[in-house]
């Protein structure tokens, strides 16, 4: 499926360039090599994640490996954390113009999620040289209370 010098960066471009409907696309995980399910392909596309190309073959990442990589990256490559104002001061840019992904599921944060970090004084984390935060789903998943 090699596309040569014009290798598409994401699943939707790959489907368009190859003339393949998303439901017919078959990709393997770059980490564990298992075939991605239809739900994993859709989630990969919605999260705007980039394909990895090896020897002219595109790879994605399954849900389990994405979560595992998020945890590993956070533990191994965390640099420091700042409140929104500190991030804006360091980067000389508004957080609204920056691509900030969730450190767990890797989805790009939308304006409301960035606002929540600002309004609730939650820190953003510099991990592997990139700013990361929590999306709405992972935020609620990490703060759920266990009944006693």
From Swiss-Prot:
GO terms for cellular component: host cell cytoplasm; host cell nucleus. The keyword Zinc-finger applies. Keywords: Activator, DNA-binding, Early protein, Host cytoplasm, Host nucleus, Host-virus interaction, Inhibition of host innate immune response by virus, Metal-binding, Modulation of host cell apoptosis by virus, Transcription, Transcription regulation, Viral immunoevasion, Zinc, Zinc-finger. A zinc finger (unnamed) spans 29-65, 102-138. GO terms for molecular function: DNA binding; zinc ion binding. The keyword Nucleotide-binding does not apply. GO terms for biological process: DNA-templated transcription; regulation of DNA-templated transcription; symbiont-mediated perturbation of host apoptosis; symbiont-mediated perturbation of host ubiquitin-like protein modification; symbiont-mediated suppression of host innate immune response; symbiont-mediated suppression of host type I interferon-mediated signaling pathway. Gene3D superfamilies: E6 early regulatory protein. Belongs to the papillomaviridae E6 protein family. Plays a major role in the induction and maintenance of cellular transformation. E6 associates with host UBE3A/E6-AP ubiquitin-protein ligase and modulates its activity. Sequesters tumor suppressor TP53 in the host cytoplasm and modulates its activity by interacting with host EP300 that results in the reduction of TP53 acetylation and activation. In turn, apoptosis induced by DNA damage is inhibited. E6 also protects host keratinocytes from apoptosis by mediating the degradation of host BAK1. May also inhibit host immune response. HAMAP family: HPV_E6. Belongs to the low risk human alphapapillomavirus family. The cancer-causing human papillomavirus E6 protein has a unique carboxy terminal PDZ domain containing substrate but low risk E6s do not possess this domain. Forms homodimers. Interacts with ubiquitin-protein ligase UBE3A/E6-AP; this interaction stimulates UBE3A ubiquitin activity. Interacts with host TP53 and EP300; this interaction inhibits TP53 activity. This is Protein E6. It comes from Human papillomavirus type 10. The gene is E6.
